[in-house]
């Protein structure tokens, strides 16, 4: 598997022992998040989504016969990624500067609206949102800084902040709430996901992995994160509906 470059930021093909996990992850896909502003598409963040190695056989059982186009258009496929019994790791790297308050308030707004709509907003979720807002309150993220989310299938969400490319050590904070843990990734690749480009990338890469023999194709290569100076040409994604 190859790495993916978004706006000169490289997402390596594998990730080993990110904060909150001792597992190895493969890069499922990556893309930008942006908005149309005065007729110009402005990119704010680059997002990479990694899945624990056990995700591939789990997803293949149901989706291996589907084309990349079918996967890209299937809400159930992305829902299976969000809720599947394996760990997920998401890296959100700033292309433009952003404050923690700006980021967390938008995430919180979207989560609460979704939970209220489906009738699952309880005191536990309210407390989890309050913790999220407090964690981000005093943070600032210049270009190149990243927010890291490690999502456990049992419900723990490990949050980390890095100013460079070193993804090591323990997380800054852990929130024990399964709905919030899933909602963070849902907000990126779900029905109203903020990165259609990442969704298309995931569908294409995972479909390609399904077509390879597990015996012959290793999705795990030497990990590493670096910044590339090579220009990257990307297709303009569909404009996201909501979120940060």
Swiss-Prot record:
Q: Does the keyword Protein transport apply?
A: no
Q: Any idea which positions bind substrate?
A: 45, 110, 187
Q: In which pathway does it act?
A: Secondary metabolite biosynthesis; flavonoid biosynthesis
Could you list this entry's UniProt keywords, alphabetically sorted: Flavonoid biosynthesis, Isomerase
Instruction: Give the positions of the site Important for catalytic activity.
Output: 103
Q: Say if the entry is tagged with keyword Thylakoid.
A: no
GO MF terms listed in the record are: chalcone isomerase activity
Q: What reaction does this catalyse? A: a chalcone = a flavanone
Name the source's superkingdom: Eukaryota
Which InterPro entries does this one have? CFI, Chalcone_isomerase, Chalcone_isomerase_3-sand, Chalcone_isomerase_bundle_sf, Chalcone_isomerase_sf
Which EC numbers does the record give? 5.5.1.6
Q: Quote any Pfam family the record assigns.
A: Chalcone
Its Gene Ontology biological processes? flavonoid biosynthetic process
Q: What else is known?
A: Part of the biosynthetic pathway for all classes of flavonoids, a large class of secondary plant metabolites, many of which are brightly colored.
Function comment: Catalyzes the intramolecular cyclization of bicyclic chalcones into tricyclic (S)-flavanones. Responsible for the isomerization of 4,2',4',6'-tetrahydroxychalcone (also termed chalcone) into naringenin.
What family does the database annotate? Belongs to the chalcone isomerase family.
Name the chain's protein: Chalcone--flavanone isomerase
């Amino acid at each position: 598997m190859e790495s993916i470059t978004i706006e000169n930021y490289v997402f390596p093909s594998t990730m080993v022992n990110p904060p909150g996990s001792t597992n190895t992850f493969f890069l499922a896909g990556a893309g930008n998040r942006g908005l149309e502003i005065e007729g110009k598409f402005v990119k704010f963040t680059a997002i990479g989504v990694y899945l624990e190695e056990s995700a591939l056989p789990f997803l293949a059982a149901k989706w291996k016969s589907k084309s990349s186009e079918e996967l890209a258009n299937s809400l159930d496929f992305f829902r299976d990624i969000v809720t599947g019994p394996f760990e997920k790791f998401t890296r959100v790297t700033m292309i433009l500067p952003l404050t923690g308050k700006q980021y967390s308030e938008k995430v919180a707004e979207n989560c609460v609206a979704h939970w209220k709509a489906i009738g699952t907003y309880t005191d536990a979720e309210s407390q989890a949102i309050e913790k999220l807002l407090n964690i981000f309150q005093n943070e600032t993220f210049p270009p190149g800084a990243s927010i890291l989310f490690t999502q456990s299938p049992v419900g723990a969400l490990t949050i980390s902040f890095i100013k460079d490319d070193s993804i090591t050590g323990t997380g800054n904070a852990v929130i024990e709430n399964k709905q919030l843990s899933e909602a963070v990734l849902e907000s990126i690749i779900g029905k109203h996901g903020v990165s259609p480009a990442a969704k298309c990338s995931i569908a294409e890469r995972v479909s390609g992995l399904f077509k390879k023999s597990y015996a012959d194709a290793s999705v795990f290569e030497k990990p590493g994160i670096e910044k590339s100076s090579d220009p990257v040409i990307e297709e303009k994604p569909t404009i996201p509906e909501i979120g940060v």
